[in-house]
């Protein structure tokens, strides 16, 4: 069915259409050009009225409205349509843009299900269902899991727009294929995920396995406390690392340094005392986090499971050290595994993971910030560059794209973009997503919960999708405060009534 015509100036990548009805943003159309049928995506749409264009007052508006209602030619429906490629090629996974722009007057048709099904729902084990096209809900949308692991993914959205639901869905689909997922859970959003084969781990840090700088961060010694840092560095010897009573040995070593320097360097007495206070805190306040007897934290991760590394009880610095440690160990393990498999090269240790791993960093702006160098950022950057060669995929999840390191974001081969209103965030996304236009980015402010623009290598084409809801996810949703208060009030009334009866009973007894 013809729904419009190409008008004005057209380009190989974009046309303007005059339609018989308003075209919805995200709607797919067919441009029936001389070279073949071309698929287009509506990016912007405008509705105009000749009668109501230049009204000056209310009475004139009323009269003009009456004229507009009886004049079939009054309304104009104009749309900007992005050209995606020839349909027959897209159905084979090839995006071929026409060399010659569609001529003005070219017919624009409504896209049918048979035109879209093969493009957005390809066959193959690597393609998994993730939702349905927003404007064509009868069309199933699939994404390529291989591309997620080999080329990484960024999931960017405001709080409450469905980021953790999408992470849960991807994790569930990977796990259905016996894959291994690791989620760094900074806000305890995933520990109650009711999915089979889930492994929840309270992330612990073994101080013996750290270097002096990392230990200083874990103990929360300030960066500008140079003397404290120096004392810790001197005390953190190989012998201390190997001593059974780790904290006691470290404290004794600090005391020895204080005594050796108390005459010549009096500042060592105060600073050394502060280090000892930090060691005492580690033994008592942070004993459930810092455990010298956990010899291999990586050993707690199970292959073929969804592993939730709960780092919600760690401070920001401690979490940074924990994330960097796990990322480093996982990358090294995957390197050893690939080398042992393909090069027949002997390694110092037996690899723990025999197949690819997908790692998700929640609240990624905390660990890979734009303005600061952190250890987690270093290893995340290394995985973003090298992970594809060793089967280690990275998922970066954040509600503050503007605060993320742009070099790492630029290496995310795929993006899921949900509702974002900050212009700085939108600018960061525009620079990271080459295959998405500024016009389409501007529309993300109008997306609803669960809606996402999918771009990059995990989809055949940029698409606006409503993401499938994960019913097993019970945490992370907004709380219904009004209902909770109503229930609390009801129980309060019951409690008061019960108390009054007890009082009356006691009075009767007396």
Residue spans of the language-model regions?
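Residues immediately C-terminal
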Residues: 189, 366-367, 402-403
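Conserved catalytic network of the ASCE P-loop NTPase/AAA+ motor domain
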Residues: 147-148, 173-177, 192, 300-301, ...
């Amino acid at each position: 069915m013809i729904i419009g015509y190409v008008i004005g100036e057209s380009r190989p990548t974009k046309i303007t259409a005059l339609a018989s009805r308003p075209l919805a943003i995200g709607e797919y159309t067919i441009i029936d050009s001389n070279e073949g049928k071309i698929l287009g995506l509506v990016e912007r749409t405008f509705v105009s009225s000749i009668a109501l264009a230049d009204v000056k007052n209310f009475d004139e508006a009323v009269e003009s409205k009456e004229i507009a209602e009886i004049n079939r030619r009054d309304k104009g429906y104009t749309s900007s349509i992005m050209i995606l490629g020839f349909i027959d090629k897209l159905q084979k996974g090839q995006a071929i843009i026409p060399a010659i722009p569609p001529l003005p007057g070219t017919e624009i048709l409504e896209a049918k299900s048979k035109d879209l099904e093969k493009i957005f729902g390809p066959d193959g084990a690597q393609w998994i269902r993730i939702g349905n096209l927003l404007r064509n809900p009868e069309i199933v949308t699939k994404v390529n899991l291989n591309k997620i692991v080999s080329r990484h993914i960024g999931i960017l959205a405001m709080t409450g727009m469905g980021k953790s639901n999408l992470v849960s869905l991807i994790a569930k689909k990977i796990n259905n294929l016996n894959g291994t997922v690791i989620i760094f859970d900074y806000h305890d959003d995933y520990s109650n995920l009711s999915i089979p084969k889930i492994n929840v781990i309270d992330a612990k840090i073994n101080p013996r396995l750290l270097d002096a700088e990392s230990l200083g961060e874990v103990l929360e010694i300030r960066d500008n406390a140079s003397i404290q840092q120096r004392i810790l560095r001197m005390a953190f010897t190989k012998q201390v690392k190997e001593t059974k009573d780790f904290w006691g040995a470290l404290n004794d070593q600090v005391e020895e340094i204080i005594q050796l320097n108390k005459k010549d360097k009096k500042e060592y007495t105060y600073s050394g005392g502060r280090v000892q206070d930090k060691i005492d805190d580690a033994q008592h306040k942070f004993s459930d986090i810092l455990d010298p007897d956990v010899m291999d934290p990586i050993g707690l991760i199970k292959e073929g499971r969804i592993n939730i590394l709960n780092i919600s009880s760690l401070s920001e610095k401690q979490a940074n050290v924990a994330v960097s440690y796990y990322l480093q160990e996982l990358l090294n393990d995957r390197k050893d595994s690939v080398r042992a498999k393909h090069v027949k090269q002997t390694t110092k240790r037996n690899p723990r993971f025999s197949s690819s791993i997908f790692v998700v960093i929640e609240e990624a702006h905390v660990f890979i910030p734009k303005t600061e160098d952190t250890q987690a950022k270093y290893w995340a950057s290394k995985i973003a560059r090298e992970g594809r060669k060793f089967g280690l995929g990275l998922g970066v999840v954040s509600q503050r794209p503007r605060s993320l390191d742009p070099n790492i974001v630029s290496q995310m081969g795929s993006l899921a973009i949900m509702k974002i209103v900050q212009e700085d965030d939108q600018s960061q996304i525009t620079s990271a997503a080459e295959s998405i236009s500024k016009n389409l980015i501007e529309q993300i402010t109008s997306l609803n919960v669960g809606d996402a623009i999918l771009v990059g290598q995990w989809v055949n084409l940029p698409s606006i999708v409503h993401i499938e809801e994960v019913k097993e996810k019970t945490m992370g949703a907004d709380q219904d405060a009004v209902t909770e208060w109503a229930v609390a009030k009801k129980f309060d009334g019951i409690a008061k009534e019960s108390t009054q009866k007890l009082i009356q009973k006691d009075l009767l007894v007396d």
